[in-house]
UniProtKB/Swiss-Prot annotation:
UniProt pathway: Polyol metabolism; glycerol degradation via glycerol kinase pathway; sn-glycerol 3-phosphate from glycerol: step 1/1
Family listed: Belongs to the FGGY kinase family.
Organism: Fusobacterium nucleatum subsp. nucleatum (strain ATCC 25586 / DSM 15643 / BCRC 10681 / CIP 101130 / JCM 8532 / KCTC 2640 / LMG 13131 / VPI 4355)
UniProt-recorded name of the protein: Glycerol kinase
GO CC terms: cytosol
Classification lineage: Bacteria, Fusobacteriati, Fusobacteriota, Fusobacteriia, Fusobacteriales
């Protein structure tokens, strides 16, 4: 038997997942690592700990499955996106901790960049992104400006930059390969996703030497070889690389224009494949590269909901209405509807398509008969409403009709939520049997490159449906409920002065 290993380097843990040809999961190994918070709003990881945890679980998953390294035909990598590492090209030592995507330390740099006439528009038109602390560009600038000697060393060509995928490729190949894929490059705010090259104008504005940047390659193809077991060990091709959300889109076999996926985690991440069209959003969504294959790219629109599953944690930990998040389905089904109650979980403001940082959460429409079941049900419904908000914006921006929604992530296991999602969208919602779609995407990309799977058609056929939820709600009722949601959202806006 031959296998593929997907390395899934996430924000809180590193995982390795072993797949066979039929996409069965043969083994999983996982190790959490340290979150570092040096100041308020700052988040860092130790790059050496990212590497040791990731290489550790790789060895562990092979040993536990009782197979030989020679049975592994390829490695795929998927990773937390935007997180930024700068290291010395000769010693391989990081000059600073990894600055994580969540870190807000460069917000001030972003404010200054926004003052430059036309710069924000230029970034949006060419990288598809917003000028924001979330993306890698300003994080690199911060390291060069604040770490002693970093700028001089970078200008001499001694330092390299990479997102987490690039760092892992560098370490796996013993410093031979400095490369990334199209999807990860598209999250740096430095990559021109129309011309498919590093953008000189942005590099100049941020004062980042081009010599630091990795080579950008197809998401599926040989990046280099991982030497497991040192000299004379088995060399395994690193053959697939994609950022986590794009990898999940691929793992859901969303290969056609209009196909979309939602990952229901703490927040929700929605991506819609827009094919070969670069679609500029007028609704606060970002445009990104969905995947790069054979020197060509497909684009996607991306929108995120800040509070998805986190609202269920709030019911459990703060309101103490439930003891386990799985109980929400039982309570939601005890009432026939939410009795006009709406929960708007704008705890940290509202994300796409509203972008109101000053909105705050609210429970609206309460009457004397409203009870805990209505509030629990309305909280689950809020996740579906917010998903609809983003998908509606995607349809408006792209002019592409939504072609069903594929779902994954923790809350996708909640049947009540999935039924309501289908009802409120008026579209089918498809849940796969393999919910590890992020890792599966990386495995697919690697497998295609080495001929483990022949082509995308074979993958599409192997994608197995667990359950399809179809809409049963009359249009009139759907429109009325959604209008109530929009009214509730209006009430929460600009609450904080």
């Amino acid at each position: 038997m031959k296998y593929i290993v997907a390395l899934d380097q996430g924000t809180t843990s590193s995982r390795a997942i072993l797949f066979d040809e039929s996409q069965n999961i043969i083994g999983v190994a996982q190790k959490e690592f340290t979150q570092i918070y040096p100041n308020e709003g700052w988040v860092e990881h130790d790059p050496m700990e990212i590497w040791s945890s990731q290489s550790g679980v790789l060895s562990e998953v092979i040993a536990r499955a009782g197979i030989s390294q020679h049975d592994i035909i390829a490695l795929g990598i998927t990773n937390q996106r935007e997180t930024t590492i700068v290291w010395d090209k000769n010693t391989g030592k990081p000059v600073y901790n990894a600055i994580v995507w969540q870190c807000r330390r460069t917000a001030k740099i972003c404010d200054e960049l926004k003052e430059i006439e036309g710069f924000s528009d230029y970034v949006k038109d060419n990288t598809g992104l917003l000028v924001d602390a979330y993306f890698s560009g300003t994080k690199i600038k911060w390291i060069l400006d604040n770490v002693e000697g970093a700028r001089e060393r970078a200008e001499k060509g001694e330092l390299l930059f990479g997102t987490v995928d690039t760092w892992l490729i560098w370490k796996l190949t013993n410093g031979k390969i400095h490369a990334t894929d199209y999807t990860n490059a598209s999250r740096t705010m430095l990559y021109n996703i129309k011309e498919l090259k590093w953008d000189e104008k942005i590099l100049e504005t941020l004062n980042i030497p081009k010599s630091m940047l990795p080579e950008v390659k197809d998401s599926s193809g040989t990046f280099g070889y991982a030497n497991l077991g040192g000299k004379g060990g088995h060399r395994i091709p690193i053959a697939g690389v994609a950022g986590d959300q794009q990898s999940a889109l691929f793992g859901q076999a969303c290969f056609e224009e209009g196909e979309s996926k939602n990952t229901y985690g703490t927040g929700c991440f929605l991506l819609m494949n827009t094919g070969e069209k670069f679609v500029k959003s007028n609704n606060g969504l970002i445009t990104t590269i969905a995947i790069g294959l054979n020197g060509k790219v497909q684009y996607a629109l991306e929108g995120s909901v800040f509070v998805g599953g986190a609202s269920v944690q709030w019911l459990r930990d703060e309101l103490k209405l439930i003891s386990d998040s799985k109980d929400t389905e039982y309570f939601a089904r005890k009432v026939k509807d939410s009795a006009g109650v709406y929960v708007v979980p704008a705890f940290v403001g509202l994300g796409a398509p509203y972008w109101d940082m000053y909105a705050r959460g609210a429970i609206l429409g309460l009457t004397r008969g409203a009870n805990k079941n209505h509030i629990i049900r309305a909280t689950l419904e809020s996740i579906a409403y917010q998903t609809k908000d983003v998908l509606k914006a995607m349809e408006e921006d792209s002019g592409i009709k939504l072609n069903g929604l594929k779902v994954d992530g923790g809350a996708a296991a909640n049947n009540f939520l999935m039924e309501f999602q289908a009802d409120i969208l008026g579209e089918s919602v498809k849940r796969p049997t393999v919910l590890e779609t992020t890792a599966l995407g990386a495995a697919y990309l690697a497998g295609l490159a080495v001929g483990f799977w022949e082509n995308k058609n074979e993958i599409k056929q192997k994608w197995v449906l667990d359950k399809e939820f179809t809409p049963n709600m009359p249009k009139e009722e759907r429109d009325k409920k959604y209008a109530g949601w929009l009214k509730a959202v209006e009430r929460t806006k600009k609450w904080e002065e």
